[in-house]
From Swiss-Prot:
NCBIfam families: fliP (TIGR01103), PRK12797.1 (NF009438)
Protein name: Flagellar biosynthetic protein FliP
Subcellular localization: Cell membrane; Bacterial flagellum basal body
Key words of the record: Bacterial flagellum, Bacterial flagellum biogenesis, Bacterial flagellum protein export, Cell membrane, Membrane, Protein transport, Transmembrane, Transmembrane helix, Transport
GO process terms (BP): bacterial-type flagellum organization; protein secretion
PANTHER family: FLAGELLAR BIOSYNTHETIC PROTEIN FLIP
Family assignment from sequence similarity: Belongs to the FliP/MopC/SpaP family.
Domain of life: Bacteria
Keyword field contains Isomerase: no
InterPro entries membership: FliP (IPR005837), T3SS_IM_P (IPR005838)
Statement: the UniProt record of this protein carries the keyword Zinc: no
Length: 245
């Protein structure tokens, strides 16, 4: 976990460097020539990039698929706040660390570690760190989604394929679309058994003339019992982790 924390901090710093290459090296040193306004603008720009970096890092990992599946599970069971958002996000984060461990290790070994040893420049380190993530995203992105952004770039006269490698500008949005789609596909399969339980309970209550009684109030205990009996968390988490290449 310590390596993961260090990796994320380094990625945030490197994202700031990559997004603000025009900033001088002494950006955090107060200017003495009176250019306070320029210094404030540069500092604000760097802090803005650093604040966005964690969100960017999450979007290029397996995190979105996990969160979508957990949210649909909670909705299908009819539970409004249980498990809480904090629990679901925390579980999704730790599952992301587990799935992305090989990618993190490679990015650390190829990019961050040589940079800390002053063996490569910041630009080279950023390229080496992004390569494992690019390969992970390409492997888990539908060809149709990836081709969509390649075609859009071609229509605008832009080139996103260099030396048979697709640029991150096309890979990241294509990967996110694919992840959202897969999350909904998994969510549909999760919802089906709970929908069947709701229909059975609703049919029984209607046959008994209890039309004023909400079927969800009766079906909720049965859905929870069903999920526990089939060891739902084990099946769901195992399927989600194995769904990644």
């Amino acid at each position: 976990m310590l390596r993961f924390a260090t990796f994320i901090i380094a990625m945030m710093a490197m994202s700031g460097i990559a997004g603000a290459q025009s900033f001088p090296a002494d950006i955090l040193n107060t200017p003495v020539d009176g250019s306070v306004a320029s210094w404030i603008i540069r500092t604000f720009g760097l802090l803005t990039v650093l604040s966005v970096a964690p969100g960017i890092l999450i979007m290029v990992t397996s995190f979105p698929r996990f969160v979508i599946a957990f949210a649909i599970l909670r909705s299908g069971m009819g539970l409004a706040t249980t498990p809480s958002n904090m629990i679901m996000v925390s579980l999704a984060l730790f599952m992301t660390f587990y799935v992305m461990a090989p990618t993190f290790d490679r990015a650390w070994r190829d990019g961050i570690d040589p940079l800390l040893k002053n063996e490569i420049s910041e630009t080279d380190a950023m390229q080496r760190m992004s390569e494992p993530f690019r390969e992970f995203m390409v492997a888990n992105t539908r060809d149709k989604d990836l081709q969509l952004f390649i075609d859009i770039a071609r229509e605008k006269g832009q080139t996103v394929v260099v030396d048979e490698k697709v640029d991150l500008r096309a890979v990241v949005p294509a990967f996110m679309i694919s992840e959202i789609r897969r999350g909904f596909e998994i969510g549909f399969l999760i919802m089906l058994p709970f929908l069947v339980i709701d229909l059975i309970v609703a049919t029984i209550t209607m046959a008994m003339g209890m039309m004023m009684l909400p079927p969800t109030a009766i079906s909720l205990p049965f859905k929870i019992l069903f999920f526990v009996l089939i060891d739902g968390w084990n099946l769901l988490v195992g399927s989600l982790v194995r769904s990644f290449i």
